[in-house]
Amino acid sequence: MEMILITLCLTTLLALLLKSILKRTATKNFNLPPSPWRLPVIGNLHQLSLHTHRSLRSLSLRYGPLMLLHFGRTPVLIVSSADVAHDVMKTHDLVCANRPKTKVVDKILSGGRDVAFAPYGEYWRQMKSICIQNLLNNKMVRSYEKIREEEIKRMIEKLEKASCSSSPSPVNLSQILMTLTNDIICRVALGRKYSGKKDGIDVENIVRTFAALLGEFPVGEYIPSLSWIDRIRGLDHKMEVVDKRFDEFLERVVKEHEEADKETRSDLVDKLLTIQSDKTGQFELEKSALKLIIWDMFLAGTATTLSFLEWAMTELMRNPKVMKKLQEEIRSSSPQDLFVTEKEAEKMNYLQAVIKEALRLRPPAPLLVPRVLSEDVKLKGYNIPAGTQVIVNAWAIQRDTTTWGTDAEEFKPERHLDTNLDFQGQDFKFIPFGSGKRICPGIGFTSALIGVTLANIVKRFNWRMDVEPQRVQHDLTEATGLVVFRKFPLIAIPSSA
């Protein structure tokens, strides 16, 4: 009996190996990009670390800026240079505008019925248009300036309490910044702040968990026969919890707005409900889609902004000369006791250079949201078949020494002075928010918040990290996820300037 089982196992393994070899031989005729040797069944999954952007960059240094990997049976094109990114997101933008289906998106975002993950087409265009017209256009972004100012001032008051004593106490700056971004997006999108203690829901934790889930690699997604591993890892349970909790929260928010005075509608939910009730339009906004728009606003408005502010403050405290130079610019441009306005922040050259450098070195989403080819395409002389997923490694591109110089790994805002380089997606060596049709539509909203926040906390306080005496270096460990936060909170000590 044992010999029969052993024979069956060996036969199965040999069959898989033979199938893999035959498939690899057959694909040679397609003139595919360079690819590392892959294992049967799992493909190249064994070559990925928890910090996928780093392992993909290491592979690209060996196999080139355009390489083909296989996640299980799924072919995935990895883009790691500005030149190839230009071809993907400009030359072939329309062919590369679709999104692949994923387990997390299917479960939490109704199969990609939101803006960020919806398939390219009329539905996506209508949803994106609703977001831009009602929240993300320049006029709307400017109209929320007072909300941003009020919440930043509240944050400064909290920090002043920690800094005013003769012995300033450490603060969890990560948590303070998370509360700031969450409160602002709640007021803008939902009309009021939602506190976990007061309202019985921890929105901040849900957003963090969801951002982490989006960066997961569910084994069952690429190897269906091993989907049981996701259950053992607790991935399926996490998705269930996030989906249930946030849906309950959004149901309550929508109900509150439906029962409120309809004559005073002004926030995003109010506007979405007005659109939903209008049956004369060409596009009917379903309730589920309405909630998914709010989901996107939380992910983009809270997660990406927090990630930037966390890492920007980390780099400034690691580079005291840069911090001092920035403080000198801000403090000389604005009286110490006054709030730095958004217009003032926009005119501060070194501040803008610091923002660009932080986005270059620490893009909130190191790997841009994956795309999938809708038809065959030719890239750099290689033939890429339809259905291939495309991942642009913005983190690797923005640290490429061939375009940024030998000091690309260093935090040097000076590299952005006296240049017209911006992050609007037109220069493909600097694409922290993507480019082309699927560029992040919330760039303006995020930009308005990060500049004024950074200006005011750097102006009002002197900062240093709360580092244990025995530690020589600052902790720069990254969390995992689509949006990459610090793994451990940024604990810092503010002192009055």
Swiss-Prot record:
Cofactor(s) needed by this chain: heme
Subcellular location(s) per record: Membrane
GO MF assignments: heme binding; iron ion binding; monooxygenase activity; oxidoreductase activity, acting on paired donors, with incorporation or reduction of molecular oxygen
Protein name per its UniProtKB record: Cytochrome P450 71A20
Gene3D superfamilies registered for this protein in UniProt: Cytochrome P450
CDD domains hit by this protein: CYP71-like (cd11072)
Keyword Metal-binding: yes
Organism lineage string: Eukaryota, Viridiplantae, Streptophyta, Embryophyta, Tracheophyta
InterPro entries in the record: Cyt_P450, Cyt_P450_CS, Cyt_P450_E_grp-I, Cyt_P450_sf
Homology family: Belongs to the cytochrome P450 family.
Species name: Arabidopsis thaliana
Residues at which heme binds: 440
Top-rank EC class of the record's enzyme: oxidoreductase
Annotated membrane topology: Single-pass membrane protein
SUPFAM superfamilies recorded: Cytochrome P450 (SSF48264)
Transmembrane segments: 3-23
Protein origin, superkingdom: Eukaryota
Gene Ontology CC annotations of this record: membrane; plasmodesma
EC number: 1.14.-.-
Keywords: Heme, Iron, Membrane, Metal-binding, Monooxygenase, Oxidoreductase, Transmembrane, Transmembrane helix
